[in-house]
A protein has these predicted regions:
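Classical nucleotidyltransferase
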Residues: 97-207
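N-terminal catalytic cores of NTP/NDP-binding nucleotidyl/phosphoryl-transfer enzymes
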Residues: 11-73
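Phosphate/ribose-recognition catalytic cores of enzymes acting on nucleotide-derived substrates
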Residues: 197-236
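Single conserved hydrophobic/aromatic residue that forms the stacking wall/gate
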Residues: 237-245
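Glycine-rich, highly charged phosphate/nucleotide-binding loops
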Residues: 69-77, 101-107
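Short acidic-hydrophobic, aromatic-tinged amphipathic segments that line or gate anion-handling sites
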Residues: 2-9, 90
Length: 245
């Protein structure tokens, strides 16, 4: 899988693609179904399959620390997108300039001229461009004008519940890890780097490890029984998580 950081770096690496746009936070079962369908369309059109992400995520840019907790880091998201067979991931920097970009300019400059999109899969509630004036109908009209197909990415449900990153965050907030796993299609995982702490564990006779999660807000809190693998050996431990990181 090829990673392109910044829309300005798309050429000459990419010219023509089957594209979807979104946060893909968690790469859950709904995302996986969208990607499978996009793979089929890309193969039929003999085009690379591309995903456009935003960093930071738009809500993080506008809401800061009040934004919903991420389910996974960008690094982990890229791992799962590669597993799903994505050919190219474009990570667009979401900053003031991008936030103020008129919707029509985003379509013409980026989707048409830079990416030469031939097929676009997007949610019918997708909003984009300055003041969120761009929408699904606008993309459909642009598709007719510039020669690319626009398709509504379907909403997927499990037991009549819409699969979404929000639903997974709600399950985690209720400590319902099994339901979160059902929606994700995989166990919920947290990755981080062990860092130096205050070494308080040495004073109470218990070894401890501080793991930095590199996120503003954690989607889980509480104390969990965990299993740690070290040098091919497993050890049962307790893990404590707070909402703030």
């Amino acid at each position: 899988m090829q990673l392109i950081r910044g829309l300005h770096n798309t050429q000459p690496y990419l010219s023509g693609c089957a594209l979807t746009i979104g946060n893909f936070d968690g790469v859950h079962l709904g995302h996986q179904a969208i990607l499978r369908h996009l793979r089929q369309k890309a193969n039929a059109l003999n085009l690379p399959m591309a995903v456009m992400l935003f960093e930071p995520q738009p809500r993080e840019y506008f809401m800061g620390n009040k934004a919903p907790a991420r389910l996974m880091r960008l690094r982990d998201k890229l791992h799962y997108l590669a597993q799903a067979g994505v050919d190219v991931v474009i990570v667009a920097k979401f900053d003031r300039t991008f936030a103020n970009l008129p919707a029509a300019q985003f379509i013409e400059d980026w989707l048409v001229r830079k990416l030469n999109v031939k097929f676009l899969s997007i949610g019918d509630d997708f909003k984009f461009g300055a003041k969120r004036l761009g929408n699904f109908a606008m993309l459909q009209q642009a598709g007719k004008q510039f020669g690319f197909e626009v398709e509504d990415s379907r909403t997927f449900c499990l037991d009549e519940l819409r699969i979404s990153s929000t639903a997974i965050r709600e399950a985690l907030a209720k400590d319902d890890l099994q339901h979160a796993e059902n929606l994700l299609g995989k166990p919920y995982r947290i990755f981080g780097r062990v860092i130096h702490g205050n070494k308080l564990g040495r004073t109470i006779g218990f070894p401890t490890a501080n793991v930095r999660l590199h996120r503003q807000v954690n989607p889980v809190k509480g104390v969990y029984a965990v299993k740690v693998r070290l040098d091919r050996k497993s050890t049962r431990l307790n893990s404590s998580h707070s909402r703030a990181s």
